[in-house]
């Protein structure tokens, strides 16, 4: 079965691409490589072939400065409080999820995610490609 990115992941990536056309994409990704294959990861396809994670390169401006990703990661975190398509976010050694009320807390995984922001999605995002209401990527929230 050919892997496919969940609709919510496709939509979020499209909004980022539309609003930051000159951004660096070298740390972007969605489909797990050999490092992901040996362990559970939302980058690995499930039984239906659906992948529920994206990585967005930190360099949104294409010039490294200004560093906008901390602000975008925080806006995604705020949106996730009401948008049930987002499962969790990892960025700059911190993770946010519903477990702790979407507050940032220390992330102790292997990769601190300093070069990209990781967003994982719930099964609700599999078929839901509705617009993310996030100010830095076209929303008005």
Name each model-derived stretch.
Residues 1-101, 114-121:
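Secreted/periplasmic proteins that engage bacterial cell-wall peptidoglycan
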Residues 3, 123-141:
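Low-complexity, Gly/Ser/Thr/Pro-rich intrinsically disordered linker/tail segments
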Residues 99-103, 131-133:
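Short amphipathic beta-strand/extended segments with alternating polar/hydrophobic composition
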Residues 104-111:
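Short proline/glycine-enriched turn/loop segments at secondary-structure junctions
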Residues 111-115, 128:
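Short glycine/proline-enriched turn or capping motifs at secondary-structure junctions
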């Amino acid at each position: 079965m050919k892997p496919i990115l969940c609709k919510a992941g496709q939509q979020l990536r499209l909004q980022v691409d539309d609003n930051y056309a000159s951004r660096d994409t070298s740390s972007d990704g969605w489909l797990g490589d050999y490092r992901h294959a040996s362990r559970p990861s939302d980058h690995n396809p499930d039984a239906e072939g659906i992948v529920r994670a994206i990585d967005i390169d930190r360099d949104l401006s294409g010039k490294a400065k200004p560093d906008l990703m901390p602000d975008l990661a925080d806006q995604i975190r705020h949106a996730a409080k009401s948008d049930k398509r987002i499962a969790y976010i990892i960025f700059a050694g911190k993770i946010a999820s519903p477990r702790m009320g979407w507050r940032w807390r220390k992330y102790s995984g292997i990769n601190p995610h300093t070069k990209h922001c990781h967003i994982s999605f719930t099964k609700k995002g599999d078929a839901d490609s509705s617009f993310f209401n996030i100010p830095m990527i076209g929303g008005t929230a």
